[in-house]
Design a protein with these regions (language model features):
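ATP-dependent carboxylate activation and anion-phosphoryl transfer catalytic cores
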Residues: 1-167
Length: 167
């Protein structure tokens, strides 16, 4: 319908859902159509450009140039106070050391963005790409776990213990 009216490329639809308190059924209503690039544009374009892939309109699956299904998990708001003070250079070191980057041979891994907000706000964005939805989620979860560990405050168990003997 939108194409017949001249719309091209992407669009986004905003929904509102309300649960009926008596029947517990959800009422889902489309409230707005956005004929512009939306929040999912960046991760999808990242997937498309890195894999040179395409959307299979018959199945709804995204396929790489080698016809391998590809999936992604993305956020533009991985935000934790403990990430504050982490410089983009530090992040690059962690990415390299832990091999968290996108690997062009397997076409899996993570692409980072919004690194300018990392040190001051403890926030960054990332797109994790896998050959299955589960793999994409595992890659994303590993990135978060590695960043959490790298920025964790030492616990009491890790801190040097005071000498229990009086001096």
């Amino acid at each position: 319908v939108l194409a017949a009216k001249g719309a091209i490329e992407r669009y986004g639809v905003d929904f509102i859902t309300v649960q009926d308190p008596h029947t517990k059924r959800w009422d889902i209503q489309a409230i707005e159509i956005n004929l512009r690039k939306g929040g999912t544009t960046h991760p999808f374009m990242t997937l498309r450009l890195l894999t040179n892939g395409r959307l299979d309109y018959d199945t709804g699956n995204f396929l790489s140039q080698q016809n391998q299904e590809k999936y992604y998990i993305a956020t533009d708001n991985l935000h934790k106070a403990q990430y504050q003070g982490l410089l983009p250079n530090d992040l690059m070191d962690i990415i390299a050391q832990e091999r968290l980057h996108f690997d062009s041979s397997s076409m899996t891994g993570t692409v980072f963005h919004l690194m300018g907000a990392l040190s001051e706000f403890g926030k960054l964005g990332l797109t994790s790409i896998g050959n299955s939805l589960a793999e994409a989620q595992e890659i994303y979860d590993r990135v978060e776990a590695v960043l959490d560990k790298a920025t964790a405050n030492p616990t009491d168990a890790d801190a040097p213990q005071a000498n229990p003997l009086p001096l």
